[in-house]
Curated annotation (Swiss-Prot):
GO cellular component: cytoplasm
Active-site positions on this chain: D15, H43
Keyword check for Ligase: yes
Enzyme class: ligase
Annotated compartments: Cytoplasm
EC number: 6.3.4.4
Catalytic activity: IMP + L-aspartate + GTP = N(6)-(1,2-dicarboxyethyl)-AMP + GDP + phosphate + 2 H(+)
Biological pathway: Purine metabolism; AMP biosynthesis via de novo pathway; AMP from IMP: step 1/2
Record has Endoplasmic reticulum as a keyword: no
Keywords: Cytoplasm, GTP-binding, Ligase, Magnesium, Metal-binding, Nucleotide-binding, Purine biosynthesis
Chain positions recorded as Mg(2+) binding sites: D15, G42
Protein name from the UniProt record: Adenylosuccinate synthetase
Main subcellular localisation: cytoplasm
Amino acid sequence: MFLANVVVIGAQWGDEGKGKITDLLSRSADVVVRYQGGVNAGHTIVVDDRVLKLHLIPSGILYPDTICLIGSGTVVDPKVMLGELDMLIANDIDISGLRLASTAHVTMPYHRLLDQAMEKQRGARRIGTTGRGIGPTYADKSQRSGIRVIDLLDEQRLRDRLEGPLQEKNELLQTIYGVAPLNAEDVIQEYLGYGKRLAPHVVECTQTIHQAARDRKNILFEGAQGTLLDLDHGTYPYVTSSNPVSGGACIGAGVGPTLIDRVIGVAKAYTTRVGEGPFPTELSGSLNDQLTERGGEFGTTTGRQRRCGWFDGVIGRYAVQVNGLDCLAVTKLDVLDELDEIQVCVAYELNGERIEHFPSSADDFAQCKPIFETLPGWQCSTEECRSLEDLPKPAMDYLRFLADLMEVPIAIVSLGASRDQTIVVEDPIHGPKRALLSA
């Protein structure tokens, strides 16, 4: 029976716990589509006490009957992707459902070298890139000089497509950044080898999705990073090079907006950010250390410590608006268990005035001071709670406050990394467009 096509997006700066929520929802999905980003994003899934860290491959790969498609809007590092496939095989996970869009762009060795060299040259003006070559790959895509997955399947086409860009990048690496040039033949042979291994998984992205839609399959679109890292709608220039927002699903997967039935946002019960850029609710000292330790706040991709802060309702409301969120999944509520009081940012002060919107200027955003409301903590463990009735009253009050502040119902509450540490308030795919936990 046809149920729904759903987009899952991050409602903050990424690292919200989308991997767990997507894993949960993938049980009801026939097709899971990753629609943007590359190996600069990571998600962690815990299965039978095994911790699996993925960067490119969708969480749905854990379900043998689910098709997992890496869409046209992604940028693919084939070496990393094949490493993930080998890791999954070693863990006895069936990878036959994996599909890779023929039109996805490929991260080449010079993209990584340029990314790292440019970030180093920026010095104090660095933007916090992961150094994985994502920005340069997307730049080549925009300049129509990129290499696509389909090019790896034909030696002559790869040679023809690579000749000009590689010569240009070698000159740039040598002349501007003092980096040794790449050998063309070595690169060609390496990437032809990747192409041979990936060939059985390569498909036409749009055709695959629309066939699934015609067959009335349930399709789950999985975004990477988060709303505030969106190239057009985030805290520019401290953003990624793609569009993690819900609208990016249509572009990156090759579907029209009428195919999307529901948009689910994922947000932590507090806020984190990796890398540079303004962060109004950022904490320091012992509180920051406590959230970092209890939340395990280190990046899946880079290992960098995440910056921690109180929940920011201003960016939360903005995420609801930009993405058209129908409901919200709140993760890591358990991280707040030991606090005697919890603060929530409800507005900003900018130049002496109260504002309740997200400013478009990064300079203005850096000057914003948070206006907080303080709520009581619950100072007891929520990790074993499996229903709303199990939650302590202050925790319920906190969730209701967030739902009211963001003007969106909460459908899922996560209380730990394991699949069973989850409260489903209403089924966000099968149920009506509402949730029980709302103001």
